[in-house]
Amino acid sequence: MSVEIRQEAAGDILNIREVTRKAFGREVEACLVDRLRGGGHARLSLVAEEDGRLVGHIMFSEATIRTEETGVGALALGPVGVIPERQGQGIGSALIREALDRCARTGHRIVVLLGHPDYYPRFGFSAERAGNLSSAYSGEAFMALEFVPGALSGVAGEFEFAPPFGAAS
């Protein structure tokens, strides 16, 4: 069986909701995906499809780093989920790698996430890189990745996820 990673299509929305609900075992993240998409905050949404069935999903949304002088554009990764029976088989990693590659190719400079500190460093994320960013979620799970080396040099401020993240907590 081959897994294809592709851009989300309008006909995928209900299936993405189901994949996300199953992956997390609750509705919160599925509602977050719906709100990010519905509010125009989503910047990239990819699905993993196997034999005509969605088995995974990843979304990146707009975010801002509020500095003293200005706002610096960034992306937030998440949610990313894979249905339970296909977890641990590389689908999540493939989604993340493909999505990061697409974001880098389209000129994005910074991506931040809140995720497992033992998982995301393999993709280049680091809590240290997010060290000058303040957030209600600061800590070892709050990590950043620079698509452009030095993109976070001299950048300090409040990291703001898109508004639906506040409604999801």
Kindly give the residue locations of the regions a language model identified.
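Short amphipathic alpha-helix that is part of the acyltransferase structural core
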Residues: M1-V33, G39-V55, A74, P149-S169
